[in-house]
């Protein structure tokens, strides 16, 4: 992956720290903090930034936690301050509704990731079609993409495209993939999608591979890359966007962002907001090693405290069971069963 074969390639960066970062903050980011971060990202030239509850539209719930404000309040506050960046949202069919997407659009959102499990694209046609009807930049987002092979991802991506998705994402929700895994899936998509349909990659840094995987995605044909300034996100965080931007600049990949401003946002704005340093630790490394949905990290830690079973053991078991997003309630059940089998008394 030398400068020569990627020099001049144009890539669109999409920041996730105000949506995926909500997971790391237990959904506790204030409207004022949202605006402060978003305006700084806008000034640094980030073209897209995602603003919602960590679980997206409809995410405020007992299962996923309650944020400090509604999605509409967050979106409206941020969108009204943007000079060039577009605000995006996450929508998981079955959790978020078309009514909530309309409300997000009315508040100022202009882009949407319509997210399904990597084998369930057929749950998204109505939501994708509605997003297109609204005139939104519309992405089909295939979560936990490591659980489907390249041919399967291509098939699911073609479905997303047929519903109206303008971009299809390979989404490494568990931070499990290695560069060869990403390359195979992106190439398979590029072979079947129409030339005008873009391909994106969303990585997590649980194995420390976020940047390498994103570069592999670009080399295979991706033109959109998700990341998070200072890596603020679920698990060990998303691909750290300021580091990725620096690598792109070294390689001659054109992102259109101001690297030094992005570095300053990470150091001066995001890091002071962190409740804990988002890094590859024992548990987040286990997420990547075992292929577990990154959002499960804090849920597993809470279950470990309650039932006296190490979080790492719980995560390995969740990986063995191939648990996916939306099954958060099963984490407590799994930990309780493991504690019973081990004869451990709950706290």
From Swiss-Prot:
Can you say what this protein is called? Answer: 4-hydroxy-2-oxovalerate aldolase 1
Any single biological process term in GO: catabolic process
Q: Which organism is it from?
A: Azoarcus sp. (strain BH72)
Pyruvate carboxyltransferase domain location:
11-263
Lineage, broadest ranks: Bacteria, Pseudomonadati, Pseudomonadota, Betaproteobacteria, Rhodocyclales
- Report the EC number(s), separated by commas if there are several: 4.1.3.39
Residues annotated to bind substrate: 19-20, 173, 202, 293
Active-site residues, as the UniProt record annotates them: 23 (proton acceptor)
Q: Which reaction does it catalyse?
A: (S)-4-hydroxy-2-oxopentanoate = acetaldehyde + pyruvate
Q: Where is this site: Transition state stabilizer?
A: 19
């Amino acid at each position: 992956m030398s400068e020569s074969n990627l020099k001049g390639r144009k890539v669109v960066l999409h920041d996730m720290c105000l949506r995926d970062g909500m997971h790391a903050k237990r959904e506790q980011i204030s409207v004022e903090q949202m605006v402060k971060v978003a305006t700084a990202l806008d000034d640094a030239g980030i073209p897209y930034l995602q603003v919602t509850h960590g679980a997206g539209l409809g995410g405020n719930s007992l299962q996923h936690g309650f944020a400090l404000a509604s999605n509409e309040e967050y979106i409206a506050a941020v969108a009204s301050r943007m000079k060039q960046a577009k605000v995006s949202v996450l929508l998981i069919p079955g959790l978020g509704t078309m009514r909530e997407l309309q409300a997000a659009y009315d508040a100022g959102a202009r882009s949407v990731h319509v997210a399904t499990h990597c084998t369930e694209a057929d749950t998204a046609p109505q939501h994708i079609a509605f997003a297109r009807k609204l005139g939104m930049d519309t992405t089909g987002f295939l979560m936990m993409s490591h659980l489907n092979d390249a041919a399967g991802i291509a098939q699911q991506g073609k479905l997303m495209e047929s519903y109206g998705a303008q971009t299809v994402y390979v989404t490494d929700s568990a931070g499990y993939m290695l560069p060869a895994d990403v390359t195979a899936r992106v190439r398979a998509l590029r072979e079947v999608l129409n030339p005008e349909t873009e391909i994106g990659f969303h990585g997590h840094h649980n194995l420390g591979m976020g940047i390498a995987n994103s570069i592999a995605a670009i080399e295979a044909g991706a033109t959109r890359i998700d990341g998070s300034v200072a890596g603020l996100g679920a698990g060990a965080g998303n691909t750290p966007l300021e580091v990725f931007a620096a690598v792109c600049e070294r390689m001659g990949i054109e992102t259109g962002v101001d690297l030094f401003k992005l570095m300053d946002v990470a150091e001066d704005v995001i890091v002071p907001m962190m409740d804990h340093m988002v890094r590859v630790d024992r548990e987040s490394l286990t997420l990547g090693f075992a292929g577990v949905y990154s959002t499960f990290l804090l849920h597993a830690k809470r279950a470990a405290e309650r039932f006296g079973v190490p979080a790492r053991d719980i995560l390995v078991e969740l990986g063995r069971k191939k648990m996916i997003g939306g099954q958060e309630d099963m984490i407590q059940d799994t930990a309780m069963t493991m504690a019973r089998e081990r004869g451990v008394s709950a706290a």
